[in-house]
Amino acid sequence: MRAFIVFLIILSTAASLAAVQPLLGLTIPRMDSSPTLDGKLDDPQWAKAAVIPYLLLLPDNGTPTQPTEILVFYTPKAVCVGYDCHESQMDKIISAAKNRDDDVWSDDSLELFFRPGTDPAPYYHLIANSLGTRYDAIYKAVGVDDASYNPDWTVRTSIGKDGWQAEFEIPYSAVGVTGVNPGDVWFVNFCRGERPVSENGSWSTLVRRFHEPENFGRLVFGDADTPIVKISTFTGLPNGMVERAGEISNPDSQPIQVRLNTTILPDGKQFDRIAPVAPNSMAKFRLQDQTTGEGQLTAIFEASVGGNAVCRLIRPFNVPPVRSRLASLTARLDALEKGGAAVQALREKQKAVSKAALWIAESPDKIDSVVRALDDLERAVLTAEFRPKVKGAEFYAWAANPWVQLKPADLPPTGDLSAISTQAYRGENVYAAVNVTSFAEQALDLRVTAGLASMPESNIQVHTCAFVKEDGDSKSLIGDALPLADQANRLIVPQYQTGQVFLIISTKGLQAGDYKGAVSICPTTGGDSQEVTVNLQVLPLDLPDDPKPRLCTWGGILNISWAKTDPMAYLKDAVDHGVNVFAVNPQSAVPALDAEGNITKPIDYTAHDKLAKAYAPYGLISGMYSIGIVYDGWAKKAGIAYMSPAYRKGFINWVRDWIAHLKSLGLGYQDFIFELADEPNGKDEFQFFMDIGRLMREADPKARTVLTANFGEYDRLKQAAEVTDIWVPHNRVLANEASVKVMKDSGKEMWTYVCAGDSKRLDPISYYRFLAWQAFRYDLAGWGFFAHMWWGENPWESKSNAGKHDATFSSVYPGANGPVTSRRWEAYWKGHQDFRALHLLKTLIAKGGGSPDALSKAKAVLAEAENAPAKLEEMQRSGIPTQAQAELLDGLRAKVAESSIELSK
């Protein structure tokens, strides 16, 4: 084949096209035979294969640091797939699975999904690790897997210095078909689980997980003359430049015209060029186009011949809004000048920024400095705009959404920000925030006064906002910690920064009606004060005490090293925020065993009883943290083999002794539960869970057990029902309808939970408050997250951990007199109040009160509330900010209140 090189360097005006992001696509060539399978991609067939040049990170479609290239073709008998996996830390890859259908996905692994039909199921799931260990399953319905399905297919792997490779040969019979013809279409996905850096990559664009058959890409079976497009570059730069480069191979004896189309979403701009490729030749291309769009954009590249797509790729990228901000600031300067303001110095800044912005097209690396200059200019313009409003004051007080994590450089938006208007049920907490932006050249020492007419001062807590590191690696600060103001209610705001007054207003003991007042900010050194008015409407509805959801935050409370000054204050804080399930570590009740499994001396329950007696008045005592695993360790130390007669005897006697002791403390079976194995998602871990569960049933059939399930496999959940009394699936499992049905059909109690480190980065609305709405949506009895308090680092500190975000799990901070609350922790409690308000409406609907129109409207409101979790997830995926998410829930709460009042008449 001779090389015919075509360079297309294009800076063009884009055409407009309304577009919807399509599925990814790839047309693969037909070859006569498979390669010699040795795990090395050096056979000549691979050089002619279709190429997937990169994977996208799940779930944000980012770029992995460890690249993966995938090669695909087919033969009369099989589909052949090759993986070339780059890895910078080969000494840290995981290859624990040795046997077929072990937990291969927990290793560094490659996952292949095949859906030959047009329906979401059945689809086939194949996995291999770097040892060539295989896992396979058929999903006969979405969420319903059968891991006993073991078809014939082959994988070979090879390990190198800087990565590893794999060759797959998948006969058609392995995926339920007898053969294929040119033009046939399958829906597939190719994925990689990389462990040293913890990167999950996918060819298809997914929402949350690999198992999304509706989002699998299109695999088209071509013929021997199918052109091959190999992309070497596909990037979107922060200056709006989109670069594509690669080569097109034409194995046909006829020339072809390849259409190279790039569409930019969401605005639908198109860049379109034709690349001619001579017979049996290769043409190189390089395309450069600049979009005028800004914000989060997606470039979709498609190469097609005769209207048939050969390949389709996407590349998300972000363009900071330099041009639009500059235009807006210029217009604001013009308005200031017309109003008589002295703006000459600002004009000079604006000209300097405009000059720097001219170089953006050639130097995308200059963007950061231009953005910083824009930030400085905007603050200066804002200062000039607000000077008349604040009558020469050095600060501006403005109403803010209390759930938005404040940053020191935040600026007030335009519009009237002088008033806060909110409503609440009787007995509910109300949250409000007033931000204070400094225009001074020195730190401001301010005093806060907050009051509402006819409301006792004790009903209002004044907090300030303390900035903490967002995580161990970030230099970014967020206003998460909310310490109580000092006795003088002082607020210190550094120069040119923004601080916050955070109010927690209790409506307990208040009558229904309007409560009006203000938050006043005044310099301690004298001068004019500023006010933000507050109007609180207390509704003629009592927030019900029932239902009382089960709330658990797992981490210890009374045994945290950084909370030793007054641990009972932290327990009170947890209880005040609804926590009523408490973990008692089984290490506090250790039995001494002999080789026959006999308990050789009385168990010392001293440490256990200290916790149990403290927690028992407030809710369930939970033998958490895998009592089975803890016992297994003790048994091994005594030389007892797993599940031997001595093992069984020791466990049963220990559990019976423990339960008898709990009863001696005045506790009944309704007061305690046992977790057998924490998150037993692996094959061996799950079998262990089942074994220990059966021993628990033998020890005491009345003792209740709980399963924290971060897996959604249908068959496993059906098995687990035998030994599970309380289901606690991870909240992502709730998206699996088949799994939820298994748990619901068991008739047993069901909660949900989440667990994520780096918790300061988690959104107060879409992570913390969200849980209660999700629990209501699925009619759950409780929910939880890890953790209210974590025994790791002091939450005021965030230490870097080998480049990974591993800050802290805690939701409160240690203070001089007990816990300092956080925005996240209060959002969690707000969700608890939402949950009870939603249940009140549900109860009123069931009673059938009110007019037919009111009842019909209430049912529609309830349906809207049940859809709120899905709406929040979509908003989060779309990058819609916290304030809009909070406004969605607050708007729904207002509708719920209105309908509840109507049905109460």
Where is each model-derived feature located?
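Structural preference for beta-rich elements and adjacent junctions enriched in aromatics
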Residues: 19-317
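Low-complexity, Pro/Ser/Thr- and charge-rich linker/hinge segments at domain boundaries
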Residues: 226-235, 311-338, 534-566
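Contiguous beta-strand segments within globular domains
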Residues: 236-245, 417-440
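Surface-exposed binding patches on compact interaction domains or structured appendages
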Residues: 268, 390-416, 439-503, 510-511
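Extended acidic/polar, glycine-enriched regions
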Residues: 282-284, 291-321, 437-446, 450, ...
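Catalytic domains of carbohydrate-active enzymes that cleave complex glycans
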Residues: 332-384, 632, 639-647, 651, ...
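Aromatic-lined carbohydrate-binding surfaces of glycoside hydrolases
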Residues: 437, 474, 505-507, 516-523, ...
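Catalytic-core region of carbohydrate-active enzymes that cleave or remodel glycosidic bonds
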Residues: 726-800
